[in-house]
């Protein structure tokens, strides 16, 4: 399906419909349908299966807003929090490096972390997570995510996205050896190998040895590695066949925010922004036709 850039909408309306004025009509219709979608909750469901392994991926992406700023540190952005759920049975291996999720449930909204909890819980139950044999949550290091998970899904397996580990190892090593040092890549590779062998404590010990040399390591060591050590048992996760990266929600988040909400001059208030986010979620989870079929049944 062709998805044209946002700024080309008036020209496309002029070409196909004979007038750019139809763009505003289409906008009103789209936002009206988005209100119906938001009010009716998730539309996509996952096929029920026995002994299912259920994944939840959570992330946040910053979007420019028109909201009043609350101080000099406020850059005029709101966080679009997104939750993606899928079954391990619905992941197809396209290539060695790429997988495709065949069925998924996706919800996103600009809101505070406290009010995203009920949305997260609704997605989990609607998708059938409470029937699964195992529930795995994949996310980055954001504290609001893990606090929400511990409140709502106490027995879920919590996994810190391995790609973030790599990023922080690179940052740590640059502090130790300096930018461009030939020691950086081999050192990072060695720590990755240890983590994939469940030797988290050994990595922490190695980082602690360099604190006197690079005091700035304290922040990375404490706020990332020490606080998330229990979510870094990658050897165990791989043995059990778990995914250890949250690339699906990263990709969805970029499509939700970057393509339609971060263009030149695009600034929204949160209420307006949440409506197109709802439409984008339905489009990306491929439940668009399901929604319209349900509307046709209601109209019959």
Write out the residue ranges for each language-model feature.
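Catalytic center-proximal scaffold of phosphoryl-transfer enzymes
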Residues: 1-300
């Amino acid at each position: 399906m062709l998805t044209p850039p946002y700024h080309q909408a008036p020209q496309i309306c002029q070409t196909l419909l004979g007038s750019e004025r139809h763009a505003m009509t289409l906008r009103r219709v789209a936002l009206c349908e988005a209100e119906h979608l938001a009010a009716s909750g998730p539309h996509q469901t996952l096929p029920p299966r026995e002994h299912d392994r259920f994944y939840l991926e959570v992330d946040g992406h910053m979007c420019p807003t028109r909201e009043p700023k609350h101080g000099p540190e406020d850059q005029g952005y709101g966080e679009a929090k997104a939750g993606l759920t899928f079954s391990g049975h619905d992941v197809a291996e396209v290539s060695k490096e790429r997988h495709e999720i065949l069925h998924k449930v996706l919800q996103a909204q600009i809101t505070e972390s406290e009010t995203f909890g009920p949305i997260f819980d609704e997605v989990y139950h609607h998708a059938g997570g409470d029937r699964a044999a195992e529930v795995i949550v994949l996310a980055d290091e954001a504290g609001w995510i893990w606090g929400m998970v511990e409140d709502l899904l106490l027995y879920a397996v919590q996994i810190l996205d391995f790609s973030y580990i790599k990023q922080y190892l690179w940052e740590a090593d640059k502090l130790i050896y300096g930018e461009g040092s030939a020691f950086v890549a081999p050192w990072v590779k060695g720590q990755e190998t240890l983590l994939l062998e469940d030797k988290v404590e050994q990595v922490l010990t190695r980082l602690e040895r360099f604190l006197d040399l690079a005091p700035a390591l304290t922040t990375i060591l404490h706020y990332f590695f020490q606080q998330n050590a229990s979510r870094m048992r990658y050897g165990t996760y791989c043995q059990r066949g778990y995914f250890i990266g949250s690339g699906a929600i990263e990709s969805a988040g970029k499509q939700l925010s970057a393509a339609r909400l971060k263009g030149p001059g695009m600034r929204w208030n949160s209420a307006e922004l949440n409506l197109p986010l709802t439409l984008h979620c339905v489009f990306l989870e491929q439940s668009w036709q399901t929604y319209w079929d349900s509307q046709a049944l209601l109209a019959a």
